[in-house]
C-alpha cells in the first residue's frame, strides 16, 4: 500500500478498496496529501468522487464508493511519467527515472508539485485551488551505506535546492478544473513552499506566501483584490469565521516545514 489511497470501514477497519498513485515509489512521492470529497457532473451524471493532487504531479479523480479511477492528468510540469494509463491505473514511466545506473534530473522533486499545504474546492466555481510548486530534483543511487550527517536520509539520494538554479524554482496559486482536468487560471509566485488555500462562498480565495503576504483573489478569475504584509512567511492555510455578524479571515504566520 505504499503511496496509496485506502478506503476503510470506520467501525471495523475492513479494507474496501485501495488505489496506488505511485507503484514502486522511489522518489519520496507520497499519497498523504489532502483528500477532497465532492459531487461532480461527469458525462452528464452526478458522481460522488474523491480528489487528490499528490506530490507526483497528477490530479486524480476517483469514484469514492468503488475506487474506480475516473481520470488522472498532470497539473504541472511532470517528467517522471508520460501519463496515467486509465485501463491499468498505473503510470507510464519515462526511461531511466529510477536512477539505477546514473543520476537523473526530473520534475517534480521530492518537494512535490503539491505538498502538505491544503488545497480547497469551491462548488460554486467548480475549481480546486492548489498551492502548486515547480521544483526539479536530482536523483542518484548513493548506496545503502550512504548517510548524510547534516541532511535528510530518505534513501533516494535526492538533492536539495542548492543544486538547482534559482530560476528553475517557482510556485503558483493554481485554479484547476477537475471535470475537464485542465488549468483555469494561475497566479505565479516568486518562490515555492507557499501557504494552503481557503475558498469561500463569496467568490473569494485566500493564500499566504513564502514572502510574507496574505492575498485575496476573486475565485472565478484569479484577480488579486487585496494583500496584507504579515512580515514573515506563511505556509498554513487561512480559516474564516463569523463574530457578531462580521466575517473574518485568520491565518497562522511563520515560515517553516
Where are each of the predicted segments found?
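Extracytoplasmic/lumenal domain signature
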Residues: 1-31, 36-46, 58-105, 136-194, ...
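Extended hydrophobic secondary-structure segments that form protein cores and membrane-embedded regions
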Residues: 50-53
Amino acid at each position: 500500500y505504499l503511496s496509496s489511497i485506502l478506503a476503510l470501514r470506520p467501525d471495523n477497519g475492513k479494507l474496501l478498496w485501495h488505489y496506488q498513485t505511485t507503484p514502486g515509489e522511489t522518489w519520496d512521492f507520497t499519497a498523504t496529501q489532502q483528500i477532497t470529497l465532492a459531487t461532480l457532473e461527469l458525462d452528464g451524471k452526478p458522481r460522488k468522487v474523491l480528489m487528490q493532487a499528490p506530490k507526483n504531479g497528477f490530479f486524480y479523480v476517483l469514484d469514492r464508493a468503488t475506487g474506480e479511477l475516473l481520470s488522472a492528468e498532470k497539473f504541472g510540469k511532470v517528467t517522471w511519467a508520460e501519463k496515467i494509463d486509465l485501463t491499468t491505473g498505473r503510470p507510464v514511466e519515462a526511461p531511466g527515472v529510477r536512477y539505477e545506473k546514473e543520476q537523473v534530473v526530473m520534475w517534480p522533486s521530492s518537494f512535490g508539485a503539491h505538498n502538505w499545504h491544503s488545497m480547497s474546492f469551491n462548488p460554486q466555481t467548480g475549481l480546486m485551488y492548489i498551492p502548486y510548486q515547480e521544483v526539479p530534483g536530482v536523483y542518484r543511487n548513493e548506496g545503502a551505506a550512504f548517510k548524510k550527517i547534516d541532511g535528510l536520509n530518505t534513501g533516494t539520494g535526492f538533492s536539495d535546492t542548492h543544486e538547482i538554479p534559482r530560476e528553475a524554482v517557482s510556485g503558483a496559486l493554481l485554479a484547476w478544473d477537475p471535470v475537464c482536468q485542465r488549468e483555469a487560471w494561475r497566479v505565479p509566485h516568486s518562490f515555492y513552499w507557499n501557504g494552503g488555500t481557503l475558498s469561500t462562498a463569496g467568490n473569494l480565495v485566500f493564500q499566504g506566501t513564502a514572502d510574507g503576504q496574505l492575498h485575496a483573489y476573486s475565485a472565478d478569475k484569479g484577480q488579486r483584490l487585496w494583500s496584507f504584509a504579515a512580515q514573515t512567511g506563511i505556509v498554513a492555510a487561512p480559516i474564516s469565521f463569523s463574530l457578531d455578524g462580521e466575517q473574518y479571515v485568520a491565518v497562522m504566520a511563520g515560515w517553516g516545514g
